[in-house]
Regions:
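Short, ordered loop/turn segments at secondary-structure junctions
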Residues: 13-14, 30, 37, 110-111, ...
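Glycine-rich nucleotide phosphate-binding loop and flanking beta-alpha elements
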Residues: 16-17, 89, 151-153
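Ferredoxin-reductase
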Residues: 1-28
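Gly/Ser/Thr-enriched, mixed-charge loops and adjacent short helices
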Residues: 19-139
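Acidic, glycine-rich loop-and-beta core segments that form the ion-binding/anion-interacting portion
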Residues: 121-170
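Structural motif
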Residues: 6-9, 24, 80, 105-106, ...
Length: 170
């Protein structure tokens, strides 16, 4: 959205095991799914491709993204928070963003690794929050946040290591 690009592709498996990684495709700033994705599959299967020239541009979107988040959030005091990156993409930008927001992040499993060596990347399953719970308690942190592979799903742990489920966060 920030670049107003005509389309995009993200490699993700979200909270699924690595063998389910695939492409999340967008066109005109909308996700491609259902009939549209089936039409794309048919084009690929038919090998009826248009040819032409194009170009590749590289743009840093992380800095503008962090600036935007910092402009809309105001955290009045430093909070010690343990973050479990789930070995997904959160580790690329998350800890840096939290520091810019004035938080004190303690990182676990923030090294991106698509084989997810530390635990399955679904933070809505209690079994996958064990490391986060232990670290929150060991560090006397105020909060723990676990992320899935593409950082669009979270699991929350309070300062005592208790899981706060989605309906409790409301």
């Amino acid at each position: 959205h920030h670049l107003k690009a005509d389309g995009g592709v993200m490699i993700t498996g979200s909270h699924n095991p690595p063998e389910f990684n695939g492409f999340k495709i967008s066109q005109d700033q909308h996700s491609l799914y259902g009939k549209k994705i089936q039409e794309l599959k048919s084009l690929i299967d038919s090998k009826d491709f248009e040819t032409g020239s194009g170009k590749i541009e590289q743009t840093d979107v992380l800095e503008p993204y962090m600036e935007h988040i910092c402009s809309i959030l105001n955290i009045p005091r430093k909070v010690k928070v343990v973050v479990d990156g789930g070995n997904g993409c959160f580790g690329i930008v998350g800890p840096q963003l939290l520091r810019k927001l004035g938080l004190d992040p303690i990182e676990i499993f923030c090294e991106p690794d698509g084989t997810f060596p530390n635990h399955h990347p679904d933070p809505t399953v209690a079994e996958n929050l064990k490391g986060l719970i232990e670290k929150v308690r060991a560090e006397n942190a105020e909060l723990g946040i676990g992320f899935d592979g593409d950082a669009d799903r979270i699991g929350i742990v309070d300062d005592n290591g208790n899981i706060l489920w989605g309906d409790q966060l409301l």
